[in-house]
């Protein structure tokens, strides 16, 4: 799925924290070869932090 499609879906679901942190989390994940579960966890934590 393209980045723009992901951002559209995150916006539609009102996942603004996840959307804001996406590029940084993905860049770090690629550099450090994070597992998919780690990436999803980091995105979810970004969303939780945004909502608090």
What residue spans do the PLM features occupy?
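Charged, compositionally biased N-terminal leader segments and the immediate start
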Residues: 1-13, 17
């Amino acid at each position: 799925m393209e980045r723009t499609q992901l951002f559209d879906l995150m916006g539609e679901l009102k996942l603004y924290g996840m959307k804001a942190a996406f590029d940084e989390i993905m860049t770090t994940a690629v550099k450090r070869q994070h597992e998919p579960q780690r990436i999803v966890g980091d995105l979810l934590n970004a969303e939780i932090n945004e909502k608090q």
